[in-house]
């Protein structure tokens, strides 16, 4: 999704489920993309002809990097790699993981853009696009336009969840999402605020919001 679209709330809800763990805001996908870029001489077209041996190697390296962030892998769990702007790499991800499932968090564009602009993000290459309102709006439009292209070009497996629907119809939205993940309902997701309390720290700008009751203003 896009920053400030409810991704941290969704992260906390999902990690409350006993069969889910969320690996938050790591660079594993970016490293995957860099590996693909090097092999294809930075040509998106050449990505299509990368051989199976290279794909297996990148896949293995990705998992090694991703699981380095957890204490012990539980093969019974589903692990979600959560970084909102990974949405721009859907094409590359599908080249390595053609059966990947994507959860796309959405929110009304005006709320999303204004919230990003007003947020005091830690500055990096991505967050530098939010230093003024115009650039923030342009960035949002570019990324959502890219998502539309991906939907047209690729027949990939995704689930969209809208922040506004989540807070107004929590149970149904989360049940549908769990169905998408082939997981049963578990009442622990209703107590996501307890999960937030137990976490050492939530490393996103929303850390003080997910422990509160659901609300539409953020």
Residue positions per predicted region:
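Conserved nucleotide-binding/hydrolysis micro-motifs of P-loop NTPases
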Residues: 27-29, 109-112, 166-167
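Conserved phosphate-donor/acceptor-positioning beta-strand/loop module used by diverse small-molecule
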Residues: 92-118, 177
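Acidic, metal-coordinating catalytic cores used for nucleic-acid/nucleotide bond scission
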Residues: 84-85, 165-169
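Glycine-rich loop motifs involved in handling phospho/adenylate chemistry
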Residues: 1-2, 81, 165, 192-196
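Conserved coil-to-alpha-helix start sites within the AMP-binding
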Residues: 87-90, 111-112, 144
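PAPS-dependent sulfotransferases, especially Golgi type II membrane carbohydrate sulfotransferases
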Residues: 39, 43-76, 113-160, 168-218
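Conserved beta-strand scaffold positions in the cores of enzyme catalytic domains, especially
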Residues: 22, 102, 158-160
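Phosphate-binding active sites in nucleotide-utilizing proteins
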Residues: 1-97, 105-106
């Amino acid at each position: 999704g896009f920053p400030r679209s409810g991704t941290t709330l969704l992260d906390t809800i999902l990690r409350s489920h006993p069969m889910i763990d969320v690996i938050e805001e790591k660079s594993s996908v970016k490293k995957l993309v860099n590996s693909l870029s090097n092999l294809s001489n930075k040509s998106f077209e050449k990505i299509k002809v990368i051989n199976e041996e290279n794909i297996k190697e990148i896949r293995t390296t990705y998992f090694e990097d991703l699981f380095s962030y957890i204490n012990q892998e539980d093969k019974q769990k589903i692990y979600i790699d959560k970084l909102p702007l990974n949405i721009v790499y859907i094409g590359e991800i599908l080249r390595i993981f053609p059966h990947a499932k994507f959860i796309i968090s959405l929110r009304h564009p005006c709320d999303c853009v204004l919230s990003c602009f007003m947020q005091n993000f830690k500055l990096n290459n991505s967050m530098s696009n939010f230093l003024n309102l115009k650039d923030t709006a342009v960035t949002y439009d570019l990324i959502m336009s890219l998502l539309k292209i991906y939907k047209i070009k690729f027949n990939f497996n995704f689930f969209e969840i809208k922040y506004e629907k989540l807070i107004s119809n929590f149970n149904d939205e989360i049940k549908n999402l769990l169905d998408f993940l082939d997981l049963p309902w578990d009442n622990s997701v209703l107590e996501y605020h307890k999960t937030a309390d137990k976490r050492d720290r939530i490393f996103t700008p929303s850390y003080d919001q997910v422990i509160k009751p659901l609300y539409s203003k953020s």
